[in-house]
Amino acid sequence: MGKPTGFIEYLRELPSELQPDSRIGNWDEFHLPMPEEKLQTQAARCMDCGTPFCHTGTMLKGMASGCPINNLIPEWNDLIYRGRWREALDRLHKTNNFPEFTGRVCPAPCEGSCVLGIHNPPVTIKNIECSIIDKGWEEGWVEPEPPTKRTGKKVAIIGSGPAGLCAAAQLNKAGHWITVFERADRPGGLLMYGIPNMKLDKKQVVQRRLDQLEQEGVKFICNTEVGKDFPTENLVKEFDAVVLCTGATKPRDLPIEGRELKGIHFAMDFLTANTKALLDHSKNGNFISAEGKDVVIIGGGDTGTDCVGTSLRHGCKSLVQLEIMPQPPLERAPDNPWPEWPKIYRMDYGQEEAAAKFGADPRSYLTTATKFEGDEKGHVKAVHTVTIEWQKNEQGRFIPSPVPGTEKVIPAQLVLLAMGFLGPEQPLLDALGLERNARSNIKADYGKYATSIPGVFAAGDCRRGQSLVVWAFNEGRGAARECDRYLMGSTDLPA
């Protein structure tokens, strides 16, 4: 590395951001650019560690350790320290088709496995990645690169989320004709409608890449659901191969008393409608408003956090986020050693904003809803909760048990269910006759991605289950490689 003592000389520093109480008044991204000289010193903190773990992409105890797409992190950190930004961008694009997406929304498992992080705060890998690609766009270094020749092969990609876009980009580079089917009115899937604008700007960031893909020859067909608007049987007739990237969009429900009441919605319905109204410039459009309401969000993951941030920007009256798991410790527990993902207490952007407005972290840990209470008009007015404790049953599995005397009633005119996803929607899979695994995901081996039907591949959450955007990138690229091998007999596409 260019600065072997950088990790000793420089402290970890993250970019400045707009204050929570001011940024909730708009839908803009709130992280501010870091000056290049500061980025160079942050890159200099990357150690000459001998065996980097940051780019390993290994699964440890069900969670990612290191970058799932094997980003060449030490290489581009060194190049940034030396001021060689264009070369750093080239290194970044070798493994990541869309670093502006992961640089904004990835939880950065690379930082959790950074060797420096064993004893000191890790290198700010995520911010450096985002800064490299943002500078690339600003300097005009990111340009459409259509393939110089075409193979004549046609590939259909079903779904334009992160896995679908990576598969499309890679297969288009290989020279195949790519058609991406998307049932929404805009391409992008989760990136367009599932992640709020303040985390990932749709017009300035997402649409920019979509435009580039179109300029490179990728064809997007929106408002088209395969199986309804486009006959399923035509897929295998009209295309030489098919890559399914439909996501895991079936939400987990909460079938307790009062579930049928008005005002109880799945989180993704809330987030999608909000972003669509924002993009359509429709203040009075068909979206679910939290304005002036007591909001209860059930679920403590990223989607729940996005519901927190969105509700605050609507102008909610109050906000409580129920989390069934215990509050994590402030530091790594002994059974959570490096290089595992550190399971520690964090305040994400949504909780920071809620604390700024209401005075405290909105999360209520070890709490579950037991009943929804309605008014005389059939609208939810309160959520009944109880504190739980995790106890082992006879099979040795931990199950939640209610603690007597801890019952509470929380006022709520809007309840958002953000408890994760159960898997892909089944009608298209049924129509194709695809085999599925025990979790109802498409059956296709990791690394091969081939389904039970020759020429049909699966990638992303529809194959692996609910996961991170960066894992979708990994699978989209991998499926593209195997699809290209199927079409041509061999492949030059990287993993």
What would you call each of these model-derived segments?
Residues 24-38, 64-65, 69-104, 108, ...:
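Ferredoxin-type iron-sulfur electron-transfer modules in oxidoreductases and energy-metabolism complexes
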Residues 87, 149, 154-158, 210-256, ...:
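Feature captures the FAD/FMN-dependent oxidoreductase FAD-binding
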Residues 131-149, 206, 211-228, 251-314, ...:
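Glycine-rich dinucleotide-binding loop and its adjacent helix/turn
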Residues 304-307, 314, 462-493:
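A conserved FAD-binding loop/helix module that cradles the flavin
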Residues 13, 17-37, 42-45, 365, ...:
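C-terminal catalytic lobe of FAD-dependent flavoproteins
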Residues 5-16, 20-32, 40-44, 57, ...:
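Beta1-alpha1 glycine-rich phosphate/pyrophosphate-binding loop at the start
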